[in-house]
Structures are given as structure tokens and as C-alpha cells.
């Protein structure tokens, strides 16, 4: 049944609001002189004009009959205007596009029948005559929703019914303090409003059943009920925001179609977003509390580390806020001296940095001395203050301020005119903060729903006119109401908490996980350009606690797969990647690099948003509206039409369940093919933090480019196009323009349509349409990578193309051609085609060639080049001969210079990676190899005949499944000598030893993760194999069918042999026995058996069957074609060497301090200081500290596997603050004299090592000791003891 009558409480609310808000009701109507009927009566007459049906409806004793005007404005959009008592219609609210005009539809309107009908190609509207009621149907007659006899349109809104199984969306999102979570709005009574702090909402209700409803209203009260099928909207009384545009008539739109079509319709009605500048697809660093020196140093560090960044945003630090008259609009030249002229702008333009400045809808009216300001006087005289908002003291500095009124066109002009100097001196983006409400001290004032829109209108119209359309406007604000998108504004989710989820650290702010629903519901409300404070903003202590490295890295990966990629923290906080340790830094950098490689792909969706209202991110229920599994799914989304993103968002996550809709999918990072329509268990490595689950939809066409430091750094002359043909034709439109101006609106753009299809039997087709638009980009050619088959013949418009021996030869060729090869996805045909031709090209690939490649080659000139400074970076050169590709890398004579490759592999394990190098320095040289943020080893590179001579050096490296970060670096701490040239690396497709951690396996029947014993591999082991049915199942991948050795690492401290059953691909292989070495559960050993596996994916499971005895602990599994030695990742003999284990569990480190002294040792992430004192690698590190005098040590004694051989000790340490009496690493009880390695007070992480430790007594004791007068801080991380 319907909810209780809403008219009475709404009217009461109206008059209550009148008392509370007084003058804020200037935009509200006077109460009507006559009452309105509660529902429509019978038809009196009808008339038809073109696509419009006008109905005169009896309203009883009221003067002037009601008017109902129904117009088919598009084939799938119906506009309805109800005018009770035939009143004069109110002006449209700013929600609707004021410039929108509708073309003739050619609807068929029949008024003779009962019901009357309006028919288009997409819809059939039936309207009964007695009483007048509407039913909305598809063109085929399928009923979608209808007005019940007791409902329908009336003076306060609309009342419809729909089938109770329909899923509803829109209406609302969530603010920064909500728990959030749901996308469904099947039963909702939440108000339609812009809300506060990251919220979005509006009078929009739509369904995946194929329809939507949009009411022209400034706020209001939607109501849906899943039990009754009610879909209603009430204008009601004044909302809490107070201010409101008046609506006497009821004007609404009905939209029919798919979710994508409905969102297009919303854009048609409320306005499409203009294209944002291309640079805004890049990475942005927002910061509170900075100055020119720090800003410049940070920018230079980004550039030195080759971490791409396009924009830097400043909080009030950039302004002379409260210091001078009109200081709100002026650069603070104390903080930014070069901004007194255009010098800072010129410097940052040269570095590729766009500067963004914060603005707020308020001005200073009295300075700190209570002197009235000029701008305050001007605003008073001009009538620019927001009605109902009084003066109050700002929380930022002790000055008196008052809200200005962007609803007022004169105020908008005034505000913009005073912003031009900032623009001239470098501010090209606007951070429009606090357009939702004032909350400062005792002051609490709400802004109206359209404040964000009008504030954005100020800067958009002003900036566009001021630059004559030559410079696109970019803005962000923290609320959204439909219509605001017309003014080039994005939405960010407000001051969210620095935590994984709400309640993890603080219970009054949302965390990272909640942002998924916030983003997706905002997209469902029509705001497709959304971002967040990556890393979080709020913390319990206000400004001190920072994200821990795991949280930071996972948040960066999440944010890289959203429309707007930005970091921000609270006052004094840093959010640059290098503050969070090497593991998090490298994972974050890889995420940024991935995004920058996808710029051509993403920019196509920037154009799409302008053309049809659908942007880069769409919820899965929009893309798959009939799939019940995704109706409320927030754990993944479409990133463009061809990529599904499902980032890791749980703390120290080891596996992730991901639902993939129907169809075929390919793992972007690992290359595995996956059948959709199921939930998969995705293994996650919490050690490396490199996993970014991203899946390619079969049929995908994905353009990518070489990563640049910033968008537009260099001309893009070649674009790679990865194509994954499906049996049905797929398409993608490549798009480009100048990226900066609005000339695209008049046809100055570049478009080229691409299609692809798998025709079977190795036959692939790819078409490149003729280019359209008048813009000519620098692009010269596409390298089309047709995955799935290596052809024997390729034609272009039926003419044979030239074949080349390799991809490198093809790239170097002057003209078009083709080659074959293999990559992580399998066999591939490469085709080089000229871009931008006036006629189309039809590429046909036939035949199936055998590809024998067993490795992938990664060129150094395509790698990430870094250094300790911009001047000392590794660099590309061509001044020698014999290199592969287009160049090689030199500059490794500078300490800190490095070359970082991003190889992809299907499975984790040990790989023989070969480095191609040149060294004619006269002696062997060395560089360190880092893998996923951790140093693995130094490699010695022999001297060669000359610099034109190249050789290879292979090293066994531990890689993780998916993308890896492999860096060759001159690292003087480790004794490297550098000064070599690097050409490429080759990485095998298959490992020497495949390694699968138990914590990432599929667990069932009671098996679970634990960390309460020592020396396990990875981050946990599996126990709970203590009851029938308990199982651990490893998902493995092998390159070919055959026999493999399986080594399962286990612990059995029961002092008796135990058994489990082994299953291969679901079939029982037999019972496996696990012997026991005694009662020590910290002793691990391998059970080895030979199994037969299929090529590709397999499962290996160990299960407690009825005949088994179970009760063992299980660790990692190794897979190899021959006997596996000790993997590189297991060569460190220490327990808990990086201090990552939860401190609630025991470990082999023994802490000592004098009995009369408090302990001065602990383990944490270093996140409680500004800047954070993060670990060297991983998520935690150990520390020594006490304010007073202290002695402290930790030690670990281990048994060595081989006696009378040499061992090596390594560690990373950082000492700061007071220099101690003694600080050292200690090595003792190994059969020789104690060895002490002193630690220097450098304030930065330093690598220390001791080699050639001859162990003769079967054990070794290593540790650290500090004797301090007080105030010394020592950080310790990644401690190692390995056999030399």
C-alpha cells in the first residue's frame, strides 16, 4: 500500500522551514490561492500539435481545468508537464540544460481510442480518459510502469507503480561519514539532494528493467518500495538546505532503454559535460601545508623517480587569505615568491605541472584586527552575500568571513574577475571546497543544492570566456546535483578517513572500501567524473596518523582505476609515494605507469562522456543489466567498455573473490583466459603489493602509448593497439584532439573507428576506418597486436603486406608490414598500419604459424629510467652500435641511476632473467637488482672488448604472478660500481620453479590461515586440516602437459606420520604420507611427488578424506620439471625477517633491555608521524626509541642447514635524532669471534652487510644493539642471513 499521505507533513515542513530560514525562501512560491486536486480527473478535451499531446482534465470545483502536456521529445524520452488549475509554468531549474532544443520525432498520437496512445520506435504510451492515467510500455507492448487509479501525477509530484522484481537506482549516494555499500534503491525514502562531503543525488530514479524517471526539481523526496512496486516523487516542503528554486507545475521526463541509453538521456536533458583537459586524466598531488621550496622539490623528485604526474593542488597556502584586501584571490608570495610574476608558472610549465588552487564560497569581511575589508564592503554594496548566512570566524585563521552567493549572476562575474590574476600566474584548475555547508565553531549554515553547480558555472563561464576557449577548465567539488556537470566539474568524496573501512580506526568517517559504492552510485546519479582523497584525510588525532604502506599502495591502485586520480591528506601530511617505503612506492609507481600507458584508451571515454554522457567508469549492472549477480555489486566495475577492474581493498589480502560476468575474459597482468559467469578466487601477494586485478573482455580493442612524465611531454607518433578478437565483431573509436582547447566542439578532432573479429580457423580481421575530423595529430602509425593467433599471411585491402622477422624489425620499418611473436597472452600477429588515412584499411590474417619463442624481451628504452636527481637519471642513447630496439640506456655511472622493467608472468616463482649489457670500462662492474621493491642481489658484469660489444648475464630472480617491478640500479650502499650500458632483459614465459603460497590457495572444510608458528614462507600457512573434508587447493599453471614434481612444504609436530589425499584436477591421485621430525611445529619439510598435469590451468588439492589422519600444517607448493632446489625467496634463514608478523604472535626475535628500564623496542608501520617513518620495504619495521637514556637489543639465533661454510648477513637500518654511544649490528655465537658492524646516524635508510661469516658450530646469532643517552631512533628492516 502507499505510504501515509505526504502532503500534510510536507506543508508543515514548509512552514517550519519558513520560520527557520526566513529570507532564504526568496525563491519559493507563495501558497496557492486555491487548493489543487489530489489526483487527475476525467478527460475534457485533447489536442495534438506535432509530437505533443495536450490534455484538458476536469478538476472539479477548482477554477480553470488542469492541463497535462505530454511530448515525445525523442524516441525514448517523454516529457510531461502537469499544470494544476492551468497555472503558468514555473521557470525550469538549473538542473535542466537551458540551451537544449528537441527535434521532431514523428510520434504517432491517437486520441480517438481509449486509452489514447503515443507511439515511437522505442515506446508506447497509453493514457486512459476516465480518469486520466498513464501506462508506459516498450514499443513491443511490454508494460514497464503505470499510474495507479489512486495515484498518478498531482500538484506535489508523481506516483507510479512498477513490477516488484525491478531493480531501482539513482536518487542518492553517500557522504564521507556514511557507511555506504549499496547501489540498489529498491526501497528508499532518502531525500534527493546534493548533500554534503562527497555526496551526490537528485530527482532521478531509473531501473535496469529499461526505464527511468527524472523530475525537474530543486531537491525533493523520492520514494520506492520493493514490496509494492511504488516509484514516487514528492516536491514536499523546504529541505534542510533552505534555499530552493520554485516549481508550481510538475515537469518530469520518462526515459526508456538500456542503462547506457538512460544515462545518455539524462545527459540530453540536464546537459553533457564538456571535455576536460587531457592532462586531467593524469595523476594529481593535492596538498595542505606546502610552499614553493617543498613543492618544487617534490615535483623534481617525481621527475627524478620517473613517477608520472600532471598536476599539483594547493590548499589555502597559495592564497593571501586574510592577509590583504582581496587576498582570497591572490597568490601568497611569502609561500610562493616566484608567483609574484609569471615566473613560477613558467617554471612549472617547463616541468609539465599544472597548478590547482583551492577556492571556497566565502570571503574575509574583517581581518584579524577586525578591520572591514575592501572585498567585504564591495560584496555588501553589490548584494553578493548568500542569503541567511551571517558572519562567522573561519576555522582556518582567526578572521571574520561570510558566504558569497554564486546563485547571483553579478556575484559570479565579480568573483571571476578577481580570479584572473591567479589564472595569469599559473592556477589552471579550481578546487571548489565547502560548497555544501559552513561548519566553523558555532556557525552552521547549509548551501542550496545548486551551489556547487553555480560555483562551477562561475569558473567555467569566466575561464572559458577569458581564454576565448583556448584553455579548458578543470574543477572539483565535494557535492553533485544534476546539471553541475555542464560546468566542467568533477566530484570528490570529501574528507574520508585514513583507514581500510569505516570503524577500522575511526567510526565516524568512511574509509577506502566504502569509496567503491560512493563512486558507482555517483555514476548512477549522472556524475561520471569522480575521485577521492587517495590515502585518506581524517584521522582520530586530526592530522598525525598516516596510511600504512599496504593501505597506501592498495588505495593508489584503486584510485588509478577511477575517473579522477588524485592523492590528498590532512594538514602537514605527505602523500608522495616515496614516503611509504620501497614496496609501496614501487607498487604505486607501477599503478601510475599503467594509467599513463592507457591515456589513449581513457581519452576516448572523455569524448564519450561529452557525446553521450557515459564516461570511463560504469557499474557492472549498467553493463550487464540482466545479470542478477551484479545488481548490487560494488567490488568491480567496467573501466571503459573493455576492462573490468577489481582492485584489492582489504588489509594484507591474500586472495580475492571476483565475479566475472558472462563471456570470455583474459587476465590483463597474467594472461590467463577465464570463462565468465562465475566467481573466481584470485591469488594476491601481500608481500609485493603488485596485484591489480584487471580483466580484458574478449573482443577488446585497447590503445596504449609509451609512458610519459606528463601528458603531452612528447609527441605520440606510434600507438600500440591490443586486440583480442571475438567471434562477433567488436569496435572501438580512437579519438584525439589538441587536449587543451574547446576547438573539438567545431570539428577540430581526430577519430578513427576500429573493428575486429575472429573468423575461426586462425582467420582474424581488423578494419581501420577512414579518419574524421579536421585535427591532425602527430600520430603516424598503429602497431596492432592481434592476440590469439600467429598468422602465415596478412593482407591490407587484399594486397599482401611485407613480413618482418620480429616486432622490433617491424617497428623499425619505414612502412607498413607484419610480424608474429608470443607474449603473456599467447601467440600474436603484429601489424603496422598507417594512421589517419582518408580511406579505410581492411586487414586480414590467415593461417596458423608455429611460434617457438620461450621468452619475452623488454627493451631498456621502453623502461622507466630514474635517478637520485633529474640530472643524474639514467637516459636513452644511441651513440654505440649493436643494440636492439631503438636505443639503449646509459647514465648508470651515477649513484642511484636505475632502469626499471615491468615484466609479466603467469605464475610466481624463480625465473632466469637475462640482462643484455655493454661494459668497456676496463674492469668488471656491478649493479644491484631489485624485484618488487626489495633488493635481491648484485650482478657482476664482465668487461667486454668495447662499447659496441654486448653480452648477457643471467640471474635467478623471484617473480610474482602478474606484473613485476625489476630494477637494475647503481646502489653504492651495496658496493656497486655501476657504469654499464643496458639494452634489454629477456624473461622466460615459464619459471624454473613455480611457487604457490598456501595463504593464496582455496581453503574449505575448516582449513584456515594462521601465523602462530615460525619460518613459514610468505605471510601465513594453513592449519585446520583436522576434520574430514578440510582441504587446501592450489590453482597452478604450467606451459605444457607432462610430468611435474610437486613439493609441498608442511609441518608435522605430532611425532607421528599423518596422511592427506592428493587430488589433481578433481581426481584423487592417492593418499600421501607426511612424516614427523618430532614435536616442533616450527620445523618445515617438503613432501615431493610426481604428478601429470595438463597444459595451462590445473588444480592440486590436499584433502582430509575419511581414511586420512590429517592434522598437519601446510605452507607453499613448488612445481618444477625436475628436482627443485631452494627458491630464492626462501634462502633467508631468519624467522620474521621484515617484522611483518602480527605482534600478537610469537617469533624468533629475542628482545633484551636492562631490568630497571622500560622496553625501548617495538614494531609498527611508522605511520604516526609527519612525515611518516615508513619501513624500508613491506608494511612494518622494528624500532628502538626512548626519550630517556636506554639500552636495547634484539637477537635471533638460528640453526644453519650446512655447517663449515660461509654465510652473509644483511639488513637495512635508519638512525636519526640523538647520536648514541653505541649502535651496531652484532653477529656472534657462530664458532668465531663476535663481529660488530657500527651503524651511522644518517637519518636515511642504509644497507649494511657482513660477508664471509664461517659458521663452524651449526648456528649463528644475529642482532642489533643501541646504548643511547636518550632520543635515539633506530629503525630496522629486511634482515637476512643467507648461505654464500
Swiss-Prot record:
GO terms for molecular function: carbohydrate binding; glycosyltransferase activity; hydrolase activity, hydrolyzing O-glycosyl compounds. Optimum temperature is 45 degrees Celsius. InterPro entries: CBM6, DUF5110, Gal_mutarotase_sf_dom, Galactose-bd-like_sf, Glyco_hydro_31_C, Glyco_hydro_31_TIM, Glyco_hydro_b, Glycoside_hydrolase_SF. GO terms for cellular component: extracellular region. Its main location: secreted. CDD domains: CBM35_Lmo2446-like (cd04083). Strongly activated and stabilized by various divalent cations. Strongly inhibited by Cu(2+), Hg(2+) and EDTA, and moderately inhibited by Tris. Its EC number is 2.4.1.24. Residues 856-988, 994-1120 form the CBM6 domain. GO terms for biological process: carbohydrate metabolic process. Optimum pH is 6.0. Stable in the pH range 5.5 to 10. It is found in: Secreted. Residues 1-35 form the signal peptide. The active site is at residues 433, 436, 495. Induction: Part of the ctsUVWXYZ gene cluster, which contains genes for synthesis and transport of CTS. Glycosyltransferase involved, together with CtsY, in the conversion of alpha-1,4-glucan into a cyclic tetrasaccharide (CTS) constructed from four alpha-glucopyranosyl residues. Catalyzes an intermolecular transglucosylation in which a glucose residue at the non-reducing end of maltotetraose is transferred to the 6-OH of an other non-reducing glucose, leading to the formation of alpha-isomaltosyl-(1->4)-D-maltotriose. Has a wide substrate specificity, and acts on oligosaccharides with alpha-1,4-glucosidic linkages at the non-reducing end, except for maltose. Belongs to the glycosyl hydrolase 31 family. This is 1,6-alpha-glucosyltransferase. It comes from Sporosarcina globispora. The gene is ctsZ.
Amino acid at each position: 500500500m502507499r505510504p501515509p499521505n505526504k502532503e500534510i507533513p510536507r506543508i508543515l515542513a514548509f512552514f517550519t522551514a519558513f520560520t527557520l530560514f526566513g529570507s532564504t525562501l526568496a525563491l519559493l512560491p507563495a501558497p496557492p490561492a486555491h487548493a489543487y486536486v489530489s489526483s487527475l480527473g476525467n478527460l475534457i478535451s485533447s489536442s495534438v500539435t506535432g509530437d505533443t499531446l495536450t490534455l484538458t482534465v476536469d478538476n472539479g470545483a477548482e477554477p480553470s481545468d488542469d492541463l497535462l502536456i505530454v511530448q515525445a521529445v525523442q524516441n525514448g524520452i517523454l516529457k510531461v508537464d502537469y499544470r494544476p488549475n492551468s497555472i503558468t509554468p514555473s521557470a525550469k531549474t538549473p538542473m535542466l540544460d537551458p540551451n537544449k532544443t528537441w527535434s521532431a520525432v514523428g510520434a504517432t498520437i491517437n486520441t480517438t481510442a481509449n486509452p489514447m496512445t503515443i507511439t515511437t520506435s522505442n515506446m508506447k504510451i497509453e493514457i486512459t480518459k476516465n480518469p486520466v492515467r498513464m501506462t508506459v510500455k516498450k514499443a513491443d507492448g511490454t508494460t514497464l510502469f503505470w499510474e495507479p487509479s489512486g495515484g498518478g501525477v498531482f500538484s506535489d509530484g508523481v506516483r507510479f507503480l512498477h513490477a516488484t522484481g525491478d531493480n531501482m537506482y539513482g536518487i542518492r549516494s553517500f557522504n564521507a561519514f556514511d557507511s555506504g555499500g549499496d547501489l540498489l534503491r529498491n526501497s528508499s525514502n532518502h531525500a534527493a539532494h546534493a548533500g554534503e562531503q562527497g555526496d551526490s543525488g537528485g530527482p532521478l530514479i531509473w531501473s535496469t528493467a529499461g526505464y527511468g524517471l527524472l523530475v525537474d526539481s530543486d531537491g525533493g523526496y523520492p520514494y520506492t518500495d520493493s514490496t509494492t512496486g511504488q516509484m514516487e516523487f514528492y516536491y514536499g516542503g523546504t529541505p534542510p538546505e533552505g534555499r530552493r528554486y520554485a516549481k508550481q507545475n510538475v515537469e518530469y521526463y520518462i526515459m526508456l532503454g538500456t542503462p547506457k541509453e538512460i544515462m545518455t538521456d539524462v545527459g540530453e536533458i540536464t546537459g553533457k559535460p564538456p571535455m576536460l583537459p587531457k592532462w586531467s586524466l593524469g595523476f594529481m598531488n593535492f596538498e595542505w601545508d606546502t610552499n614553493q621550496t617543498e613543492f618544487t622539490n617534490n615535483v623534481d623528485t617525481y621527475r627524478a623517480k620517473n613517477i608520472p604526474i600532471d598536476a599539483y593542488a594547493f590548499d589555502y597556502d597559495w592564497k593571501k587569505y586574510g592577509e590583504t584586501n582581496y587576498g582570497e584571490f591572490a597568490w601568497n608570495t611569502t609561500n610562493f615568491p616566484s608567483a609574484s610574476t609569471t615566473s613560477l608558472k613558467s617554471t612549472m610549465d617547463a616541468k609539465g605541472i599544472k597548478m590547482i588552487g583551492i577556492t571556497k564560497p566565502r570571503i574575509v569581511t574583517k581581518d584579524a584586527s577586525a578591520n572591514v575589508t575592501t572585498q567585504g564592503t564591495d560584496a555588501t554594496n553589490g548584494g553578493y552575500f548568500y542569503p541567511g548566512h551571517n558572519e562567522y570566524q573561519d576555522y582556518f585563521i582567526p578572521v571574520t568571513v561570510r558566504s558569497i552567493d554564486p546563485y547571483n549572476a553579478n556575484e559570479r562575474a565579480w568573483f571571476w574577475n578577481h580570479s584572473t590574476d591567479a589564472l595569469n600566474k599559473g592556477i589552471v584548475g579550481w578546487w571548489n571546497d565547502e560548497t555544501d555547508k559552513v561548519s566553523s565553531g558555532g556557525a552552521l549554515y547549509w548551501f542550496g543544492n545548486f551551489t556547487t553547480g553555480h560555483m562551477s558555472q562561475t569558473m567555467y563561464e569566466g575561464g572559458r570566456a577569458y581564454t576565448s576557449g583556448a584553455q579548458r577548465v578543470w574543477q572539483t567539488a565535494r557535492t553533485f546535483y544534476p546539471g553541475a556537470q555542464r560546468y566542467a566539474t568533477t566530484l570528490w568524496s570529501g574528507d574520508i578517513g585514513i583507514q581500510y573501512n569505516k570503524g577500522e580506526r575511526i567510526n565516524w568517517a568512511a574509509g577506502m572500501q566504502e569509496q567503491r559504492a560512493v563512486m558507482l552510485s555517483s555514476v548512477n546519479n549522472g556524475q561520471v567524473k569522480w575521485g577521492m582523497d587517495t590515502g585518506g584525510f581524517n584521522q582520530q588525532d586530526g592530522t598525525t596518523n598516516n596510511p600504512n604502506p599496504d593501505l597506501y599502495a592498495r588505495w593508489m591502485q584503486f584510485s588509478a582505476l577511477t575517473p579522477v586520480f588524485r592523492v590528498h591528506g590532512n594538514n602537514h601530511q605527505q602523500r608522495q609515494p616515496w614516503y611509504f617505503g620501497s614496496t609501496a612506492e614501487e607498487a604505486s609507481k607501477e599503478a601510475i605507469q599503467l594509467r599513463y600507458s592507457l591515456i589513449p584508451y581513457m581519452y576516448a571515454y572523455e569524448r564519450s562522456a561529452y557525446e553521450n554522457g557515459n564516461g570511463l567508469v560504469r557499474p557492472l549492472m549498467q553493463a550487464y543489466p540482466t545479470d542478477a549477480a551484479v545488481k548490487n555489486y560494488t567490488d568491480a566495475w567496467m573501466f571503459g567498455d573493455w576492462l573490468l577492474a577489481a582492485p584489492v581493498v582489504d588489509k594484507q589480502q591474500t586472495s580475492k573473490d571476483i565475479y566475472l560476468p558472462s563471456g570470455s575474459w583474459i587476465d590483463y597482468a597474467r594472461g590467463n583466459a577465464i570463462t565468465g559467469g562465475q566467481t573466481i578466487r584470485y591469488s594476491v601477494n601481500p608481500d609485493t603489493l603488485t596485484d591489480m586485478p584487471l580483466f580484458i573482455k574478449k573482443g577488446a580493442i585497447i590503445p596504449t602509448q609509451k609512458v610519459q612524465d606528463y601528458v603531452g611531454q612528447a609527441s605520440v607518433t606510434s600507438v600500440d593497439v591490443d586486440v583480442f578478437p571475438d567471434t562477433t565483431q567488436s569496435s572501438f573509436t580512437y579519438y584525439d584532439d589538441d587536449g587543451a582547447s574547446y576547438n573539438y566542439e567545431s570539428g577540430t578532432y581526430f577519430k578513427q573507428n576500429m573493428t575486429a573479429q575472429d573468423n575461426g580457423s586462425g582467420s582474424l580481421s581488423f578494419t581501420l576506418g577512414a579518419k574524421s575530423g579536421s585535427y591532425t595529430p602527430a600520430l603516424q602509425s598503429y602497431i596492432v597486436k592481434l592476440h590469439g593467433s600467429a598468422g602465415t599471411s596478412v593482407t591490407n585491402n587484399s594486397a599482401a603486406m611485407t613480413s618482418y622477422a620480429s616486432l622490433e624489425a617491424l617497428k623499425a620499418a619505414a612502412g607498413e608490414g607484419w610480424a608474429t611473436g608470443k607474449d603473456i597472452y599467447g601467440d600474436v600477429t603484429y601489424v603496422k598500419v598507417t594512421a589517419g588515412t582518408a580511406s579505410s584499411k581492411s586487414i586480414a590474417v590467415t593461417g596458423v604459424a608455429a611460434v617457438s619463442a620461450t621468452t619475452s624481451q623488454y627493451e631498456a628504452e621502453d623502461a622507466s629510467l630514474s635517478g637520485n636527481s633529474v640530472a643524474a637519471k639514467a637516459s636513452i642513447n644511441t651513440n654505440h652500435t649493436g643494440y636492439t630496439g631503438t636505443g639503449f640506456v646509459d647514465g648508470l655511472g651515477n649513484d642511484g641511476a636505475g632502469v626499471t622493467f615491468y615484466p609479466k608472468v603467469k605464475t610466481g616463482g624463480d625465473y632466469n632473467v637475462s640482462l643484455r649489457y655493454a661494459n668497456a670500462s676496463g674492469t668488471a662492474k656491478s649493479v644491484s637488482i631489485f624485484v618488487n621493491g626489495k633488493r635481491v642481489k648484485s650482478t657482476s658484469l664482465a668487461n667486454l672488448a668495447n662499447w659496441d660489444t654486448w653480452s648477457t648475464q643471467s640471474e635467478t630472480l623471484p617473480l610474482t604472478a602478474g606484473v613485476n617491478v625489476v630494477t637494475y640500479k647503481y646502489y653504492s650502499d651495496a658496493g656497486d660500481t655501476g657504469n654499464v650500458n643496458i639494452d634489454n632483459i629477456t624473461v622466460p614465459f615459464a619459471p624454473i620453479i613455480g611457487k604457490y603460497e598456501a595463504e593464496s590457495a582455496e581453503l574449505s572444510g575448516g582449513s584456515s590461515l594462521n601465523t602462530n608458528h615460525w619460518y613459514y614462507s610468505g605471510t601465513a600457512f594453513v592449519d585446520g586440516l583436522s576434520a574430514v573434508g578440510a582441504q587446501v587447493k592450489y590453482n597452478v599453471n604450467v606451459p605444457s602437459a607432462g610430468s611435474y614434481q610437486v613439493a609441498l612444504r608442511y609441518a608435522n609436530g605430532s611425532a607421528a606420520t599423518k596422511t592427506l589425499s592428493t587430488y589433481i584436477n578433481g581426481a584423487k591421485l592417492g593418499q600421501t604420507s607426511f612424516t614427523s621430525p618430532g614435536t616442533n611445529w616450527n620445523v618445515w619439510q617438503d613432501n615431493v611427488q610426481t604428478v601429470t598435469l595438463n597444459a595451462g590451468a590445473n588444480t592440486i588439492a590436499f584433502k582430509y578424506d575419511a581414511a586420512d589422519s590429517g592434522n598437519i600444517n601446510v605452507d607453499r607448493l613448488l612445481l618444477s620439471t625436475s628436482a627443485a632446489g631452494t627458491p630464492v625467496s626462501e634462502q633467508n634463514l631468519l624467522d620474521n625477517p621484515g617484522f611483518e608478523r602480527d605482534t600478537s604472535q610469537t617469533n624468533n626475535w629475542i628482545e633484551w633491555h636492562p631490568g630497571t628500564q622500560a622496553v625501548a623496542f617495538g614494531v609498527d608501520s611508522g605511520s604516526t608521524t609527519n612525515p611518516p617513518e615508513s619501513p624500508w620495504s613491506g608494511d612494518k619495521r622494528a624500532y628502538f626509541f626512548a626519550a630517556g637514556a636506554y639500552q636495547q637489543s634484539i637477537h635471533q639465533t638460528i640453526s644453519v642447514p650446512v655447517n663449515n661454510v660461509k654465510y652473509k648477513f644483511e639488513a637495512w637500518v635508519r638512525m636519526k635524532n640523538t647520536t648514541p654511544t653505541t649502535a651496531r649490528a652484532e653477529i656472534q655465537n657462530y664458532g668465531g669471534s663476535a663481529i660488530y658492524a657500527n651503524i651511522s646516524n644518517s637519518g636515511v635508510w642504509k644497507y649494511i652487510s657482513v660477508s664471509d661469516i664461517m659458521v663452524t658450530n651449526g648456528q649463528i646469532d644475529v642482532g642489533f644493539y643501541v646504548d643511547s643517552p636518550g632520543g635515539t631512533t633506530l629503525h630496522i628492516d629486511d634482515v637476512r642471513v643467507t648461505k654464500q
